Amino acid sequence: VSCVLFDEFHERRKDADLALALLREAAPVLRPDLALVLMSATLDLSDLRDRLPQAEVLESAGRCYPVETHHQRARENESLPRQVLRALENHALTLPHGSGALVFLPGLREIERCRTLLSDANALQRWRIAILHGQLPLDSQSAALHRCGPEHDGTVILASGIAESSITIDAVRLVIDSGLSRQLRYDPNTGMEGLETVPSSLASAEQRRGRAGRQSAGQCVRLWSPAEQQRRPNFSPPELLLADPQPILMELAQWGAGLGNDLPWLDAPPQAAMQEGLSDLQALGLLQPNGQLSPTGRQLSTLGVHPRLGLLMLEARGRGCSKLGCDLAALLSERDPLAGCDAGCDLEARLTVVDQHRTLHERSRQLQQQLKRLGPPATKNNHSANAAELVLRAFPQWLAQERPGQPGRYLLRQGRGAVL
């Protein structure tokens, strides 16, 4: 290996920032000839020049056709799906036959709502409506990328951020940008990361706009006003500043870097969050008081999952119920399979659908394979296969006591209230 490329570095993913910091520390000693390249069409060059003054800057104009940009403000009480429909009616119907219109939406919920509305719209009866997001199986993703047949005038592709930079979609002449993105954010009260809907950055908007000019001249409709454009951030904040510190700390422990205070970060993780994460991992028995991996922590680090989910899986393995543990880990790491079904919050009800749910079943199967690499479990009996106890082992902060005389209201062990 002579070069390590960090593509789409403007996204500032936490894994990319961590890998860059580790390489910048190790390369001068172990591989001074190793080249590190940060790539993107929308890099924050002024900031990177300040942080990496020795770095050489290479710029390439590439090939891109002109893209005409329009702004469309939302009308009073106009839902996002109706904004998308209005933009399509105004701009898509005059496109050449077989063209594609790529609609950027923040997530699956918005994609499904738009698909429902557009499928019933009279103006789009001869248009194929396709969806594209990261939870789709690969064959379904590939199907969304195909040109429409002669029976359709064109294709509307309702996409998440996966279409921003990861793939090329043929025949796209129109981009409709909702201006919204999902941003990863850690909630210390739950001990889990979640996705928050936020206005997308100008760098993201420029990436999306460029999709309309890959193969021919195109148009981009932004569903916000020029005034709102001025208030948007230039770049998204680095994930490292908002992410769960526990997986990062486990990586640093394997590296022998402690809290990472001496690493050459571009943006160092917040020290308060790192200290809290360190305390949590020590309480879970994954790190020793000196910050090194415990025997359980070393075993868990081979699984490649979140520390809490890995601990749940190891606990299940020790009790002889590995499949149950992997089913639970899959449920806790993927979208709720019963979302929108008025199914309450019962974990057992969700366990019953794992094997029928394609994404969850495949994820659980992968986790079971990872557990098998550790060798046979200590016991093969299944006498204590209790889902709640397994989850509690990984998330002790979720233990709650019902408040006297207040059905459905609980007091969590750390003192916060909860409503079921």
Give each language-model segment a name.
Residues 304, 309, 315-319, 323-420:
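Extended, charged helical/alpha-beta scaffold domains that provide interaction surfaces
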Residues 1-312:
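P-loop NTPase motor module signature
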